[in-house]
Amino acid sequence: SSRPSNLRGLQGDVVIDEAAFHEALDELLKAAFALTMWGARVRIISTHNGVDNLFNQYIQDAREGRKDYSVHRITLDDAIADGLYRRICYVTNQPWSPEAEKAWRDGLYRNAPNKESADEEYGCIPKKSGGAYLSRVLIEAAMTPV
């Protein structure tokens, strides 16, 4: 479970998947890192969710030497080069070809909502914002009448 309280009192390595999208990442990490006193390892894995979030801050802290973490960046192109599409073809019983691989990759980028979303999802490049949406009703409710 991804509830911070569920980690309390446990031992062992922790993997936090899609960390950038976790609502209580700070509390989850606090509980997870407490396990490191017993030698546990904590792996924080995620697609980016903009630049303004705790996941991206941890990446920056590691890159700038403020934390003793290592950053591993794997783009879609890296995964393809390591055989991702070949594996997909094998598992789904489809024939592999360089042309099919290129068409598959190009289709993922082409069908993303926009270039920034594709770059974030497949290229490990965070968007300038997380894309939070405020409804018109919420905005109008906060406006001061003129």
Placement of each model-derived feature along the sequence:
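Non-catalytic, compositionally simple segments
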Residues: 25-146
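Conserved RecA-like ASCE ATPase "motif II neighborhood" in helicase/translocase motors
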Residues: 1-34
